[in-house]
Amino acid sequence: MAIVLAKSRQTSSVARMKQSGPAGFKCLPIVLASLVLCSGCSILPGFNKKLPGNRAFIDYWAPDSNSKQLRLAVKDNIDIKGVVTTAGSEIFSRTHKPAEKDAPCLAIARRRKVQIVGKTNMTEFAVSTSGMNEYFGTPVNPLKRNLIPGGSSSGNAVALASGMTDVAFGTDTAGSNRVPAACCGVVGLKTTYGLIPIEGVYPVEPHLDTVGPMGKDIDHTVQGMDLLQDGFAAKYAAAKAAKPTARSIRVGRLKLKGTDPKIDQAIDDALAKTGFQVVELDDSLSDKFEQAKKDGTTVAAAGAWISDGRFEFALGVAARTKSVIQFGQITYTTGYRSALARRSAWQRTLRDVFEKVDLIALPTLQKTPPGLPLLNLRIGILEAHLLQVQNTVAVNFAGNPALAVPVPLSGAKVSFTSLQLIGPRLAEADLLNAGRLVESAVNR
């Protein structure tokens, strides 16, 4: 009876949101929380004893201790020949056959005989930001065990921060490389939409999906990008030669309401210490950024429904994942097409901004990483909170590249936060050059 009641509550919540139309978007985080709360089954972080140590990996192939090859981890929504692509899901791990071929994004790594050390853990179907996984277990944030690792590329970030890999390939649809990088103190790059092939990658939202590298530092992230795009090392060298110091780089500082003042101060301190030419961007851009954030969330959530709606009531799919799918059904029917219609205007806005500055700077997250919830009812609240505090999805909505790089933070529960740098299309080399300068300055 409890399960029937839970389903009826979910249905009534969805129905009310549909009736409210686009204005109902303001209530979506509340609905997401309530859908999880009413799911009718346990959704506490799981533990699968088959996984090694910190649960960073779903499949792990220990490297030769004497090898000097670059170690590469691959998120488990990217096909590796002969290995089941689980996308972080119990149902896929039980029903899917091993991939028949590698995803094309692995071609360069294979040619260079990079040592692939495993398939990394992730949030199921890559559709939530906490980094939690009910079946394979939640990867343990090595910097503070009681904090979320961030997602959906949680295993990548934990493996990097734990020293288990040098580079990781992940996907970023709404922040999935940058958010875990921000939570675990590593580097994450979201690449320009369409730059890296996404064939052989389990989809979330084809308008937003990207593949990109994560690294334990900027140098390794550059190496990761060079494994994804032939000739990138030369582009990066050219970017360093063109702008060897921060004084020649104009950075537009974007400030958003609701950001922890300590985090804003940490971002300002990092920019000042690096020596960029900092230009304050006006509030009108902040308003447009917030609208793009809402639109990007709408499109990303709808993508979860489009890609995974068939699993809404399937056994072997986590309740929290089902709630995101239901959330996506709401956004698909109430705002998906109108959000996509506003995309070109947001892209034009950013192009205009990049006529005046080289890069845009803001925090990756408006708050410090939250703790892992201990009660079911807190999980929905956590996911809704993360929708509000991540500054990532507006970038995916535009298709531009962005870099998350750790910087020091004072007076908080963690000693770091994450600076997000946004660039024009195809500016990955410029972003990593700027990240190099930041990393060097804050570590002096």
Where are these regions (language model features)?
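Serine-dependent amide/ester hydrolase catalytic core
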Residues: S307-F397
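Short helix-loop capping/hinge segments that flank enzyme active sites or metal/cofactor-binding pockets
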Residues: Q69-F92, D295-Q347, A404-S415
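Bacterial N-terminal signal peptides
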Residues: P29-S39
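Short, well-ordered alpha-helical
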Residues: G40-A103, F125-S128, P369
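Structural helix-boundary/capping segments
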Residues: S42-L44, R111, Q115, S162, ...
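Gly/Ser-rich, acidic/histidine-flanked active-site/gating loops
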Residues: L72, I78, V84, A107-R111, ...
